[in-house]
């Protein structure tokens, strides 16, 4: 179970994911592509999941992991992803 799920599509998303894991918070960083996953190095507190998720897949992920916090650090133009994250959290 991850305390935080970060949707990382920006440099800031990668930095947030690293910061949280360095402070011993279990983080799942979701990135859209394999290329994006190369920007993060997994460790005992950081797991990286590559692949685009639709709203239902996000709901399933949130139900399964029961995170305390979900962060949207996707690209500002990724409005559809932001809406899916918001809907998935409801």
Predicted regions and their residues:
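Active-site-proximal loop->helix
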Residues: 38-43
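Glycine-rich, highly charged phosphate/nucleotide-binding loops
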Residues: 44-63
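Hydrophobic/small residue at the entry helix of a nucleotide-binding pocket
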Residues: 12
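Glycine-rich Rossmann-fold phosphate-binding loop(s) that bind the pyrophosphate
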Residues: 9
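Short, polar loop motifs at secondary-structure junctions
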Residues: 31-37
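Extreme N-terminal starter segment of soluble prokaryotic enzymes
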Residues: 1-4
């Amino acid at each position: 179970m991850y305390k935080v799920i970060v949707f990382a599509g920006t440099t800031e998303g990668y930095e947030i994911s690293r910061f949280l894991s360095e402070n011993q918070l279990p983080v799942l960083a979701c990135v859209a592509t394999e290329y994006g996953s190369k920007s993060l190095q997994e460790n005992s507190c950081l797991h990286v999941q590559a692949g685009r998720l639709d709203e239902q897949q996000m709901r399933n992920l949130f139900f399964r992991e029961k995170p305390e916090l979900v962060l949207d650090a996707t690209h500002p133009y990724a409005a559809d992803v932001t809406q899916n994250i918001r809907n998935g959290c409801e």
